[in-house]
A protein has these predicted regions:
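Basic nucleic-acid-binding alpha-helical/helix-turn surface characteristic of O6-alkylguanine DNA
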Residues: 1-130, 179-191
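Histidine- and aromatic-rich ligand-binding microenvironments
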Residues: 113-116, 144-147, 159
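Regulatory, non-catalytic segments
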Residues: 132-146
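Short Lys/Arg-enriched helix C-cap and helix-to-coil transition segments
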Residues: 147-154
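…primarily DNA-binding HTH/wHTH and HhH modules…
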Residues: 157-191
């Protein structure tokens, strides 16, 4: 458990078109999520990764036993990563222990809809911190809630695909953006 975080109760793994993902929760809501591993079919890799992030927290093997909001979120994330145009359901994010600046970055990032992008600098400007583009990038690099907090929609200056610390790196970021662009009626590559 991260310092200052509320306890995580359990996590579920679920399949998507891009590979296995996971959602973790506790009494405070969603405590974390995991985008597909590089070896997207490797359930053991997912279990190891979740065990590293949430030591001692059990995997919920029956998704029907997860809270209703987590069940709905897993279905929506799978649909989104399968190329469907869906708005993810609103879930409580456990922000205990999240530094205030990072919480502000996540709140502003949540305003970006499918197919929309913004640069790190534009996001910093929206936060009233126009010289904080690098700090915005670092905050998004710490994002424990991807893709619920859609950090993949924040890009480098000029639309460059930079700064994606999730498994698969910038290639995964580009795949996710391409799926969303097609879903909203675009042709793929955003830039």
């Amino acid at each position: 458990m991260a310092p200052g975080r509320a306890p995580t109760t359990a996590w579920i793994g679920f399949d998507t078109a891009l590979g296995l993902c996971a959602l973790a929760w506790g009494d405070g809501g969603l405590t974390g999520s995991q985008l597909p591993e590089v070896d997207s079919s490797n359930s053991e890799a997912l279990r190891r990764h979740m065990a590293d992030r949430f030591p001692g927290v059990p995997q919920c093997l029956n998704p029907a036993e997860a809270p209703a909001e987590i069940q709905a979120l897993s279905v929506a994330v799978a649909a989104q990563l399968g190329g469907e145009l869906v708005d993810l359901p609103t879930v409580r994010l456990d922000m205990h222990g999240v530094p205030p600046f990072e919480a502000r970055v996540y709140a502003e990032t949540l305003r970006l809809g499918p197919g929309q992008t913004m640069t790190y600098g534009e996001l910093a400007y929206r936060l009233g911190e126009p010289s904080a583009a690098r700090a915005v990038g670092q905050a998004l690099g710490h994002n424990p809630f991807a893709p619920v907090v859609p950090c993949h929609r924040v890009v480098g200056a000029g639309g460059k695909m930079v700064g994606f610390s999730a498994p698969g790196g910038v290639q995964m970021k580009q795949r996710m953006l391409d799926l969303e662009t097609r879903a909203v009626g675009g042709q793929g590559d955003l830039f």
